[in-house]
Amino acid sequence: MTAESNYLDAIEALEEDNRELALEHARKAVKIDPEHVDAWRVISDASLPGLRSQPTLKQAAQSLTAAKKVVALQPDDLGMWVRGGRLLSDELGLYMEALQWWQDARHQAPDEVTPIVEQAAILADMGLYGEATERLQSIFDENMDLATTQYSRVARLHQMCQLASQQDPKEHFKPWEKHHDGWSAITLRMNKAPISESKIFLIISTPLLMLEVLMAPQVFGPGFGGFCLTSLLILFTVILGMRISRRWFQRLNRPAFNLLRAMDFETSTGYVVIPEDIRISKLFMFILSRRPPAFQERMLKIVDAGDKLKGDWKPT
């Protein structure tokens, strides 16, 4: 059979959601013709478990390898650039490699805004807010077009960076600094799971709302006018409660966000920085259990390897 015949069989198998058979035919196609870009694309697609499932470490690695082949053969395939970047950062936690991946994508598609937004998001997650701000600013300086779905994300990233710029840079948690105050904050909260924003909202707003419902008839009186005033008061309380809850959510869960950053640092660099007592804590297990399976597998391999961070390491 020719490479094209195997490719067509792979497409048919993939449409029937028979991923193993699709992989078998697609691999035969690229063995015959190593530059069959469509077959490599099928390998990347079929290596992933599907929309409702998250890939294992092996599946993510296989899909990423095929995606690299696709962009090498067809550099203008933005879809594969996006897939590779998401696999590197979201599934595997390889933030350093993801930054370079998106930089390569920018060279191939200089007018595309997606690589810049993704770089800014990664830099913000790593605590490098200055660099993230520069990426976001370049979008506006170059008057680049944003998709409707990207506006809210860019606005959220910009707000995060603006708030960070108002803080002392020393307050920004840097996992590679052994004696940073952020480690002490993590230690204090390591035996408690993060508190959800909805729970904070209920704690703050429920007593006030109950009091308003009980007191409103006496204050505003019966009738339609009293009902309208009561509704406005409840609406104001809900909006105020949501704003306060959001603020307290960030403050109370800062140790959890710090630990999340430390975990991302470990998977990005392959170095172990989290102390053992924190690694076996309730907070660490809570966060790890909510990370993708591929991320969890990589984290365990890094811990087993036990490579400690040495010297005065700094991000470059």
Task: Annotate the PLM regions.
Residues 2, 36, 77, 112, ...:
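Residue-level recognition of tetratricopeptide repeat
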Residues 192-265:
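Transmembrane alpha-helical hairpins and terminal membrane-anchor modules
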Residues 11, 44, 49-55, 89-93, ...:
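Short coil/turn linking the two alpha-helices of tandem helical-hairpin repeats
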Residues 16-25, 51-69, 92-104, 127-135:
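Structural signature of tandem alpha-helical TPR/SEL1-like repeats
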Residues 1-32, 42, 48-55:
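Alpha-helical segment of the N-proximal tetratricopeptide repeat
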